[in-house]
Regions:
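BZIP DNA-binding basic region
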Residues: 105-106, 112-159, 163-166
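Short helix-coil boundary/hinge micro-motifs
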Residues: 1-133
């Protein structure tokens, strides 16, 4: 069963669909929901492609935290982007579109977010590596959730200070 997003770190639609793919694996607890994600979208046979795309998009998200981009991730996303088109709608707005499957839709959403600037708000938690949407005004968020990883970090710091004072 896929994790759901009712937490404050959930990206707004449609970027939430990208976040769902990226978080289809819990790296900290070694749980992989990718087969469920694919089955829900009728793509059970696209697992290899999905794993490559998920890894590449994660690398792009880590770049939002300051990690250098790797060439393989860029090449994977660029290859997937060939199934996506840039269009101008009747109002003159530019949008990214595809008639492809759910993975192509994820690529279109990600590229659209890069164009509109919202991509920079998707980040990887420095503790658990979960992808979260940074809602802080200055885009300085570092944890997936203050209740989870933020609390863990602060508790460790408190214990360290306390043991040093003894």
């Amino acid at each position: 069963m896929l994790p759901r997003y009712d937490l404050p770190n959930a990206a707004p639609p449609p970027l939430r669909e990208v976040q769902l793919l990226l978080n289809s694996e819990d790296l900290e607890n070694e749980i992989d929901w990718l087969p469920d994600w694919l089955a829900e979208r009728g793509l059970a046979r696209a697992e290899r492609r999905a794993r490559a795309l998920r890894a590449a998009l994660r690398a792009l998200v880590r770049a939002n935290n300051g990690t250098p981009l790797d060439d393989e991730a860029v090449a994977t996303v660029n290859a997937a982007a060939r199934r996506v088109s840039i269009q101008v709608d009747a109002s003159g707005a530019v949008r990214v579109a595809t008639d492809g499957d759910a993975l192509d839709q994820v690529v279109a959403i990600a590229l659209g977010a890069m164009l509109d600037g919202s991509w920079g708000r998707l980040k990887a938690c420095r503790h658990c590596r979960w992808t979260f949407y940074d809602r802080s005004p200055n885009r300085s968020g570092t944890w997936c959730s203050m209740q989870l990883c933020g609390n863990r970090k602060k508790t460790r710091a408190y214990r360290k200070r306390r043991s040093a004072a003894r």
